[in-house]
A protein has these predicted regions:
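Active-site hotspot residues in diverse enzymes, especially metal/ion-binding acidic/histidine motifs
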Residues: 1-250
Length: 250
């Protein structure tokens, strides 16, 4: 079997391998990493284990005594699916980047910082590998075809793939033909945003530090009065200068 040359190609190949064995989702990254690397590489991943280091979601490090590699992760993370994506991320570093250094330390800001100028190319590539491995596009499309996208539908996909809601929403944005944008905010200001391809062409992007529209803040403040799946149509000037939008918030 020829080794792929890009993160997405690696993810696609190993995702197909997982599905070909008849195994269900979510992909067991630990099992796959251990089995694949020991049969294909002289310096395999020898162990996947918790590390107990606060603030470090995941690490990939070479073990000097054994000459193999270790993936370790923060077992105290409570966000559903985040550990699984972290393992996929570190597996991506192994496949694509292990020739460049002997240790990778990754925190949550590295895993999600898609639009920061300071975000390293390698982190983006590791994220891309994990996305293609854990959430194959063809299967994802089957889960959402002929359905209206909603918070609960994306939540179903997140549960199926063992990924966080955020990672799942980002995957949908990568494959959708709709103009859509994910916005993550804290304390009434945008932390980061990620647009779909069509939304990007329409200049639908909010940079970090942008104030969240007052109407959205008021809506979240009254969260008990609306359903998670309730979409509200808002006019131009709220999320885009000239376009209306359908807004869903959690």
């Amino acid at each position: 079997m020829t080794d792929p040359t890009t993160p997405s190609a690696w993810g696609i190949q190993l995702s197909k391998l997982w599905m070909a064995t008849g195994q269900p989702f979510p992909v067991d990254v630990k099992q796959l990493a251990l089995e694949v690397t020991k049969t294909r590489f002289p310096d395999p991943i020898g162990i996947v284990t918790p590390h107990g280091i606060p603030g470090i979601d995941g690490m990939l490090s070479k073990r000097k005594t054994k000459g193999d590699w270790c993936i370790s992760y923060d077992e105290t993370v409570t966000v559903p699916g985040r550990i699984n994506f972290t393992l996929g991320h570190e597996f991506g570093h192994y496949l694509v980047h292990r020739q460049t250094r002997k240790e990778f330390r990754c925190g949550q800001s590295d895993l999600l910082d898609y639009n920061s100028v300071a975000s390293m190319k390698m982190e983006s590539e590791a994220n891309r590998f994990a996305s293609f491995l854990l959430m194959p596009a063809n299967d994802f499309r089957k889960q959402i075809e002929r359905q209206v996208i909603s918070i609960d539908l994306l939540g179903h996909c997140a549960e199926r793939y063992g990924t966080s809601f955020t990672a799942t929403a980002l995957k949908w944005l990568e494959i959708t033909a709709e103009a859509a944008i994910l916005i993550v905010a804290r304390d009434d200001f945008v932390c980061w945003s990620y647009p779909s391809k069509l939304a990007s062409r329409k200049a639908a992007y909010l940079p970090p530090g942008t104030p969240v529209p007052r109407s959205a803040i008021d809506r979240l403040g009254g969260a008990a009065q609306h359903s998670r799946n309730e979409c509200r149509r808002v006019g131009p000037g709220v999320w885009h200068s000239t376009m209306e939008a359908e807004e869903a918030a959690i």
